Amino acid sequence: MLVNSTCPHDCPSTCALQVEKLSNTKIGKVRGAPENTYTAGVICSKVARYKERIHDPNRILKPMKRVGAKGSGRMMTITWEEALEEICDKFTKIEREYGSEAIWPYYYAGTMGLVMRDGINRLRHEKKYSGEHQTICTNQAFNGYMVGAGKMLGVDPTEIKESDNVVIWGTNAAITQVNVMSHANEARRTKKAKIIVVDSYRNATAKQADLFLCVNPGTDGALACGVMHYLVKNNLHDIEYLKTFTDFNSEFMAHLEKKTPDWASSITGIKKTDIEQFAKLLGNNPRSYFRLGYGFTRQKNGASNMHAVASLPAILGSWKYKGGGALMNNGSIYHWDKTLIEGLDCIDPKIRLLDQSRIGEILLGNKEALHAGPPVMAMLIQNTNPMSVAPDLNKVNKGFSRNDLFTVVHEQFMTDTAKMADIVLPATMFLEHDDVYQ
């Protein structure tokens, strides 16, 4: 029996799946569903092997309580009743002694299901626990793109096959977005389109490119400005489009005057001739599709980099062509009422917002990171593994090692973070619960 489903992972493709259901507790093969016109039956090897993950003998299937030192992973099995009772008792005592903000629910994108990912916020808001400022992944990219494109939306990725140039910037699509490459290669095969890759190292995607620009990390904005300078100087920009649909003005043009390809080359490490070749390809073929990733935004100037790069399809007028424009994220096209899921009707604006990227400093009592509020004395962690992915892991490890920190981890496997927990709760996988994905 085949059951339709959707991939839950933090990948832009949101692949449609067909899952072989062998019984109510066992699955067989996982395949791509051909009905989705974008993913078209293609899925990555990670999801194709989900049978191995869901039936892995090392899965956590029962609640556990720590019996060894923090980090040892030594646990004993307990009942759900025992686990929930201890969690509630500890949280209640901490709230009475330190206030509700001493408890910090912490999560991210282990699943992209709106209920299983964001539902933790309902508990947070109802109980007035500390908020979470989600800074690890997307903030710089989102802000830069909205300044450069206006809204968090882009061109339907199925239009890639109509493009004359497919620019893959700051994402290793051959590994992380296999469907992008399927459509890009179709455009190259049927329309003789050029695949242009901008990244800071020669990855699997770069090896498939017609033109690869290896940019020094953090200098993508300079490359974009150098290209725009060349376009303007050689009258390859779309003046009518700029006048009609953008806020580009004389001040912006003056800004570009000194941003020559020579200037960009000295900063980016890319040859002047390669920058000019890139600009010519775009200027002579404005039906260009820019697939923008997050990689080039994860530094202090990340938003500025994204702003500059997102301005390229505007100065070219690419947006007016089928197969032209840009895509970074299409989140703005969905209009969910998430009041029930997240408890949006009981948000207290006075509750502090703690930076998830500074979890190490927060757990070690940095007053500024804590906004001069109470120490974090308890955490409920879902859908993320901060002991592996958070910045400054030495501080994170030291923070989680505190004997006075009560940590609850909701997880599928015994991760590094789960090994630090006082209580571990078993988490379902996407085929074991209902959810909504966008």
Residue ranges and their predicted role:
Residues 13, 96, 100, 236-237, ...:
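Intrinsically disordered or highly flexible coil/loop and linker segments, enriched in small
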Residues 1-234, 248, 271, 382:
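N-terminal export/assembly segments and adjacent metallocofactor-ligating motifs
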Residues 104-106, 197, 214, 289-293, ...:
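A structural signal for short, well-ordered beta-strand segments and their strand-loop junctions
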Residues 227, 246-364:
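Active-site phosphate/pyrophosphate-binding segments
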